[in-house]
Each structure stands twice: as structure tokens, then as C-alpha cells.
From Swiss-Prot:
Gene name for this UniProt entry: UBI4
Family designation: Belongs to the ubiquitin family.
Species of origin: Candida albicans (strain SC5314 / ATCC MYA-2876)
Descriptive protein name: Polyubiquitin
Keyword set includes NADP: no
Single GO molecular function: ubiquitin protein ligase binding
Phenotype of null mutants: Confers pleiotropic effects like an increased sensitivity to mild heat shock, increased formation of colony morphology variants and induction of hyphal and pseudohypal development. Induces cell cycle defects, as well as sensitivity to thermal, oxidative and cell wall stresses. Rapidly lose viability under starvation conditions.
GO cellular-component term (any): cytoplasm
Length: 229
């Protein structure tokens, strides 16, 4: 079948492939046509970076699909990931790698599924779709890996305007953490947020489990007047 590869310069390359071809094979074909070494190629499809050992059919890439080709910065960089057991893992990454990519690399090395990984840097939990450069993570930075309780849970936050926000949380998350997640989604600073559950205002240092907030519970968000009490 034919697929297309679009470069950052806007050029489109046509390739003859089989669904059973690996991403490595595709990179070799691109090298044959364009002279770009495979180790400098990153291929993206449906927003996801494609891994060398996988096949086109693994990613549901069908005839006339378009892949995007991004060139790697020469050589990338090393970062460290420290686990709760004190073990330190070294990873080869690019600043343009997403947190998803980093979790996949940790899975390759340690066998921990990405959905059980939480990565922390500078006290902040890192979100999957963001890149290392978004968080200003540079060479030889150290991330901390915390394992999620199985799968976490969803809760809802209802604002006074009637809008409902869905959040991914753990029962062990503090009210501060929840307010940070609301800030990430809605841009409201935590110090302007008051969260109410079961008629009770929630205190920052307490956890969701302290208040018996379970999956699919609904919290109410009230905005503090600036300078109020």
C-alpha cells in the first residue's frame, strides 16, 4: 500500500509499504529516498511518536495515511528518574519528547505500565501530553517516579456557572493538588478557589479520602472574592 510522509518543510514523500512493516523499515525507506539517517528521524501519527519495533498495523496506519516526520536534535540528552525505592534510572530523551514518551521509555526499562506511573518534577505532577521543554526539564534533571494506586479515579467539579469539569485524581491527592488541576484546566488560581463537598468547605492540606470523596463524586467550586475573608 502507499502511505505519505510529510516533513516540517511541507514536502510530502510517498512510500510503498506493507502493514506488517516495522517503523524501522519505514525509516530505512525514508533514508533511501531522502538520505536522512533513521536515528535522526521521529515519526508521528495521530499525535503519537511511533516506536521502532512496532508495525504499521499496530498503530492502525492504513493506505494513504499521512505520517509526520520530525528531525531529532542531534544526540538528545540524558535525564534521571528516581523511584521510591531509591533506584535511579537513566533515560536518553529529547526536549521535545512528551511525558507519554518518557513513560514508555520507563516501561521499556522497568516494565511498569504508563498508566501506573506518576512523574514529579519541581513538586509538580507532569501531564502526559506536555513536553519536557514545557516543564523546563533540561539535561541531567532528576524526575521522581511515584506509582499510582491502581488506575486512580474521576471526580467532577461543578462551577457556579453550571459548567462541569472532569478531573483525574487519586484518593491520596490533597485538596491543594485538586486546586492545581483545576488551575491547569481553567486558569483559576488556587487561592481564589473554595471547594465544597457535602456542604463542607474542604481544607488544603487534607486528602480526598479524608473527606470520603470517591469516584464520580461531585465537588462544588465557589470563587473567593479577592481580598475577602
Amino acid at each position: 500500500m502507499q502511505i505519505f510522509v510529510k516533513t516540517l518543510t511541507g514536502k510530502t514523500i510517498t512510500l510503498e509499504v506493507e502493514s506488517s512493516d516495522t517503523i524501522d523499515n519505514v525509516k530505512s525507506k525514508i533514508q533511501d529516498k531522502e538520505g536522512i539517517p533513521p536515528d535522526q528521524q521521529r515519526l508521528i501519527f495521530a499525535g503519537k511518536q511511533l516506536e521502532d519495533g512496532r508495525t504499521l498495523s499496530d498503530y492502525n496506519i492504513q493506505k494513504e495515511s499521512t505520517l509526520h516526520l520530525v528531525l531529532r536534535l542531534r544526540g538528545g540528552m540524558q535525564i534521571f528518574v528516581k523511584t521510591l525505592t531509591g533506584k535511579t534510572i537513566t533515560l536518553e530523551v529529547e526536549s521535545s519528547d512528551t511525558i507519554d514518551n518518557v513513560k514508555s521509555k520507563i516501561q521499556d526499562k522497568e516494565g511498569i505500565p504508563p498508566d501506573q506511573q506518576r512523574l514529579i518534577f519541581a513538586g509538580k505532577q507532569l501531564e502526559d501530553g506536555r513536553t519536557l521543554s514545557d516543564y523546563n526539564i533540561q539535561k541531567e534533571s532528576t524526575l521522581h517516579l511515584v506509582l499510582r494506586l491502581r488506575g486512580g479515579m474521576q471526580i467532577f467539579v461543578k462551577t457556579l456557572t453550571g459548567k462541569t469539569i472532569t478531573l483525574e485524581v487519586e484518593s491520596s491527592d490533597t485538596i491543594d493538588n485538586v486546586k492545581s488541576k483545576i488551575q491547569d484546566k481553567e486558569g483559576i488560581p488556587p487561592d481564589q478557589q473554595r471547594l465544597i463537598f457535602a456542604g463542607k468547605q474542604l481544607e488544603d492540606g487534607r486528602t480526598l479520602s479524608d473527606y470520603n470523596i470517591q469516584k464520580e463524586s461531585t465537588l462544588h467550586l465557589v470563587l473567593r472574592l479577592r481580598g475577602g475573608f
